[in-house]
């Protein structure tokens, strides 16, 4: 068995902190004995090309040994027009080539044209940060317009929703309209206390039964007349036939009990 494979090894899922972390404990930070942070990097390489933060993003032409024809790089429009007019030296070169191809001025004119195009290309590169800032500005303005439109739509939807909720709240908490009056077919009129009248008739019937021993015919006649009068009183409100029949049936049952 290979050494080290027999015993169980504990492996941390995270790497150990760097050694300089021990110099920045809470106690040392509170006491002020912690070392100062390292200085930020001012020089670095990207894809093999060196960059320095103190220098301009685009190095001047003098660092490359090229003569700079423009003076003010901030006024790039005017400088670009000057360089564009300087391309007229190309016609001088053509004239030299036509008249004296071996004249030493030929090389000078070719160098001038080469330098002019390098200056134009460099001036365009100087304008790249300005172009980038304008592109970001235009992008942000478009995003602001889109967000403003979205916020306006949300406000419109919110106002519409509030109107709907307020209308529903008024319908719930407001005073409800009175119910419509019942029709003639469903109207029930129990005038003069019909139920109370039935109870009184039943009591009168019980009293008549007690007085039956004295006079059998008279109570029967008076009770029958009283029941008919009660029926007329209860049905004079023109109630539904079902209610009238129910009351008449109860009175008939009371008559049969006698």
Curated annotation (Swiss-Prot):
Residues 203-217 have a biased composition (Acidic residues). Pfam families: Med7. The keyword Transport does not apply. The keyword Signal does not apply. Residues 1-39, 202-243 are annotated as: Disordered. Residues 220-229 have a biased composition (Polar residues). GO terms for cellular component: core mediator complex; mediator complex. GO terms for molecular function: transcription coregulator activity. Its main location: nucleus. Keywords: Activator, Nucleus, Transcription, Transcription regulation. It is found in: Nucleus. GO terms for biological process: embryo development ending in birth or egg hatching; regulation of transcription by RNA polymerase II. InterPro entries: Med7/Med21-like (IPR037212), Mediatior_Med7 (IPR009244), Mediatior_Med7_sf (IPR044888). Component of the Mediator complex, a coactivator involved in the regulated transcription of nearly all RNA polymerase II-dependent genes. Mediator functions as a bridge to convey information from gene-specific regulatory proteins to the basal RNA polymerase II transcription machinery. Mediator is recruited to promoters by direct interactions with regulatory proteins and serves as a scaffold for the assembly of a functional preinitiation complex with RNA polymerase II and the general transcription factors. Component of the Mediator complex. Belongs to the Mediator complex subunit 7 family. This is Mediator of RNA polymerase II transcription subunit 7. It comes from Caenorhabditis briggsae.
